[in-house]
Amino acid sequence: MTPAAPASLLKNDIPNSNAIGSFVEMMKLKMVFHILITTFVGFYLGSKVELEMPLMWHTLLGTGILAIGAFALNQAIEKDFDKLMVRTRTRPLPTDRVSRTAAFVFGLLCFAAGTGYLWVAANPLTAIIGGLTLVLYAVVYTPMKRYSSLNTLVGAIPGALPPLMGWTAVQNNLGMGGLVLAAILFFWQLPHFLALALMYKDDYRLGGFQMLSVTDPSGEACYRHIIVQTLILVLVSVFPFLFRLAGPWYLACALICGGYFLLAGVTLSRRRTRESARALFFTSLIYLPVLLLVMAWDKAILFV
């Protein structure tokens, strides 16, 4: 078995040694912020004329609480395995700066608070989708990572639901616009996380996670899925234009950015290096916010 992190590593690399700082670190607020951006875009695109500001803030707050709870439960479940990975061994739980019990209790409280808050402040449909998102992430996806390489596909489902929550908060229905946004997020996550799995395949192997890059060491399956899923993403990204969620400027952006994303995937499949996997990963990080920003901007122009 791979040993836990040496004491010298833990002393020098732990970013927050105090209790409050460690708890905040466990919340993964940067990732929560990214989730809230997609939620806001769903809310904005679902709004007919003007933003209902109180409802928007209530939706973002409830969604943020649920996201924090999901991350806490995920880390509580994976504590022992995170100790084995270089990338995760200095997190609050593997270093015992936050106990597993505290993380579990905190995560469950966030689940109850976030779901209840959305039920009252937004609507029951949004609360149900939010609660389902947490359950899929923490109860289904997290343990599945140790047993099946399909975990990436399953994990993309909860990752795709926040923009749908934004849409349902204002529309109170599963409209085509919200489903299209969820589809874009779903297919974006697949090349994004497969690139990450290729970058850290040795680390995932140490942790015992059955990522596709671990179960297929040649990488052939990863490269094939990256190309196919990125192609599907480019096609799905045209739907907001077809359903009049955005206009021609967005369409041009979707095709240009999608083409560049696909080129990064093709480059990875040919070169098969960690550097090209990293390039695809960072391309995905640029692609999504640009796409969503132009979508929102073009929607504003379309309905002026």
Segment roles from a protein language model:
Residues 2-18, 77-98, 194-221:
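Cytosolic, membrane-interface loops and tails of multi-pass inner-membrane proteins
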Residues 37-40, 91-94, 110, 154-170, ...:
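Small-residue-rich segments of transmembrane alpha-helices in multi-pass membrane proteins
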Residues 37-41, 45-79, 87, 111, ...:
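Membrane-embedded alpha-helical segments that form the functional core of polytopic membrane enzymes
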Residues 65-73, 135-143, 184-201, 234, ...:
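Transmembrane alpha-helical segments that form the membrane-embedded catalytic/substrate-channel core
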Residues 87-127, 217-241:
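Multi-pass membrane catalytic core of lipid/isoprenoid biosynthesis enzymes
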Residues 99, 221, 259-290:
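Interfacial loop-to-transmembrane junctions
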Residues 293-304:
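Juxtamembrane boundary at the C-terminal end of a transmembrane helix
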